[in-house]
UniProtKB/Swiss-Prot annotation:
PANTHER family: UREASE (PTHR33569:SF1). Pathway: Nitrogen metabolism; urea degradation; CO(2) and NH(3) from urea (urease route): step 1/1. The lineage of its organism: Bacteria, Pseudomonadati, Pseudomonadota, Gammaproteobacteria, Pasteurellales. Belongs to the urease beta subunit family. Keywords: Cytoplasm, Hydrolase. Pfam families: Urease_beta (PF00699). This is Urease subunit beta. It comes from Haemophilus influenzae (strain ATCC 51907 / DSM 11121 / KW20 / Rd). GO terms for cellular component: urease complex. It catalyses: urea + 2 H2O + H(+) = hydrogencarbonate + 2 NH4(+). HAMAP family: Urease_beta. Gene3D superfamilies: Urease, beta subunit (2.10.150.10). InterPro entries: Urease_beta-like (IPR002019), Urease_betasu_sf (IPR036461), Urease_subunit (IPR050069).
Length: 101
């Protein structure tokens, strides 16, 4: 091995396989851009984002870890959400859940 060399496996990296997903349409009704990170509880996002929040409970964006989706003012965008894994316990964000889903 050469210092700094990468040894990568062949093939694609699969994430969120077997988890529940849902596609929703989101509108930014505000006057400023809103960016949502990969692991933010989508149900608790900025109220200027208009969408069916009941579908988003316990869900996050289905994008690679560390990525985000930006919603420009007035923009309508379709996004895919994926269910949180683990014990389904959510704390923080806007403190709307603070416990088990």
């Amino acid at each position: 091995m050469i210092p700094g060399e990468y040894q990568l496996a062949e093939g694609d990296i699969l994430a969120n396989v077997g988890r529940k997903t849902v596609k929703i349409e989101v509108t930014n009704s505000g006057d400023r851009p809103i960016q949502v990170g990969s692991h933010y509880h989508f149900f608790e996002t900025n109220n200027a984002l208009k969408f069916d929040r009941t579908l988003a409970r316990g869900m996050r964006l289905n994008v690679p870890s560390g990525n985000a989706v930006r919603f420009e003012p007035g923009e309508v965008k379709s996004v895919e959400l994926v269910a949180f894994g683990g014990n389904q316990i959510i704390y923080g964000f806007h403190n709307q859940i603070d416990g088990k889903l």
